Amino acid sequence: MVKVGINGFGCIGRLVTRAAFDSGKVQVVAINDPFIDLDYMVYMFKYDSTHGRFKGTVKAENGKLIINDQVITVFQERDPSSIKWGDAGAVYVVESTGVFTTTEKASLHLKGGAKRVVISAPSADAPMFVVGVNHEKYENSLKVVSNASCTTNCLAPLAKVINDNFGIVEGLMTTVHAFTATQKTVDGPSGKLWRDGRGAGQNIIPASTGAAKAVGKVIPELNGKITGMAFRVPTPNVSVVDLTCRLQKPAKYDDIKAAIKTASEGPMKGILGYTQDQVVSTDFNGDTHSSIFDADAGIALNENFVKLVSWYDNECGYSNRVVDLVCHMASKE
């Protein structure tokens, strides 16, 4: 089983750790966070306002974090090059601080003995992979990769199915996105993005997102054909993508539903979900799919112009894909 170190024990770091234990696919052997001491790690991992209490056991013992009787080495280094990943047995590092997102910065982990790094965020220059979409293009020569964003992980599987079956001429995406840690609880300063500084719990906030353009990086045929924006809304978790696109090949809405359902039961099983139920956002809290197509929420204006709706737990689904990407990379060693 591949041994993993987690850098940054924030929301995604903790949920990747949960996903590792829940799935049993990878073994977390080390965690680094200079801002969270060991006892606080125990508390933060045990209790989660969104996903509930961890169902296993968590404790601190002899300077180590023990989760389900598994011993995890804890570091508190600010400089990634100072973390002794090799000593702890970590071969792969999940870079989830949100700070070291370039190839150069993420590569600092390699100095401490790690073999490869997966950035749990979009990257300006690291190759981006979306499991179920382009993960097969991963090559063993790559040391640092990005798992893209939660929104790209929702949009890309849907866009791939539509493009493969009907062809996308052009598209606009809107994500109605739960608030995240980058936002303010009450109005405050926010650099050049003034709207982003408004109270997250009080407002629907129009915001930018690179998620749609990033789809062009993971599906080259769609490069320059899709762009999008976000509305940040006052909910703590679960977001939804609205993809409005013009199709090359005319298709009835039922044909589109059938193509997505087939993909969800076949090549994209576990990645792309499908529902015809009368669902709302909280119904997807804890869902491990990257994207769950809502068959009854979409509409077609005609056979070439459609609006498609797909849900995602922007924390849980994404964290599970980080684990899946690590597993896929390890299988190529």
Swiss-Prot record:
The answer to whether UniProt assigns keyword NAD to this entry is yes
Q: Where are the transmembrane segments?
A: none
Residues annotated as carrying S-nitrosocysteine in the record are 150
Task: Please report which protein family the annotation says this sequence is part of.
Answer: Belongs to the glyceraldehyde-3-phosphate dehydrogenase family.
NCBIfam families hit by this protein = GAPDH-I (TIGR01534)
According to its UniProt entry, the function of this protein is described as: Has both glyceraldehyde-3-phosphate dehydrogenase and nitrosylase activities, thereby playing a role in glycolysis and nuclear functions, respectively. Glyceraldehyde-3-phosphate dehydrogenase is a key enzyme in glycolysis that catalyzes the first step of the pathway by converting D-glyceraldehyde 3-phosphate (G3P) into 3-phospho-D-glyceroyl phosphate. Participates in nuclear events including transcription, RNA transport, DNA replication and apoptosis.
Look up the EC number in the record and give it. 1.2.1.12, 2.6.99.-
Q: How is it modified after translation?
A: S-nitrosylation of Cys-150 leads to translocation to the nucleus.
What pathway is this protein a component of? Carbohydrate degradation; glycolysis; pyruvate from D-glyceraldehyde 3-phosphate: step 1/5
A single Gene Ontology CC annotation of this entry is: microtubule cytoskeleton
Q: Which residues bind D-glyceraldehyde 3-phosphate?
A: 149-151, 180, 209-210, 232
Keywords in alphabetical order = Apoptosis, Cytoplasm, Cytoskeleton, Glycolysis, NAD, Nucleus, Oxidoreductase, S-nitrosylation, Transferase
Q: What is its main location?
A: cytoplasm
Q: Name one GO molecular function term.
A: glyceraldehyde-3-phosphate dehydrogenase (NAD+) (phosphorylating) activity
Q: What is the lineage of its organism?
A: Eukaryota, Metazoa, Chordata, Craniata, Vertebrata
Which residues of this protein are catalytic?
150 (nucleophile)
- The primary gene name is gapdh
**Site description Activates thiol group during catalysis, residues in chain:** 177
Localization, UniProt: Cytoplasm, Cytosol; Cytoplasm, Cytoskeleton; Nucleus
Q: Which SMART domains does the annotation name?
A: Gp_dh_N
The UniProt entry, under Pfam families, shows:
Gp_dh_C, Gp_dh_N
Which biological process terms from the Gene Ontology are attached to this UniProt entry? glucose metabolic process; glycolytic process; microtubule cytoskeleton organization; neuron apoptotic process; peptidyl-cysteine S-trans-nitrosylation; positive regulation of canonical NF-kappaB signal transduction; positive regulation of type I interferon production; protein stabilization
Known catalytic reactions: D-glyceraldehyde 3-phosphate + phosphate + NAD(+) = (2R)-3-phospho-glyceroyl phosphate + NADH + H(+); S-nitroso-L-cysteinyl-[GAPDH] + L-cysteinyl-[protein] = L-cysteinyl-[GAPDH] + S-nitroso-L-cysteinyl-[protein]
Return the protein name.
Glyceraldehyde-3-phosphate dehydrogenase
Q: How does it assemble?
A: Homotetramer.
Which positions does UniProt annotate for NAD(+) binding?
11-12, 33, 78, 120, 314
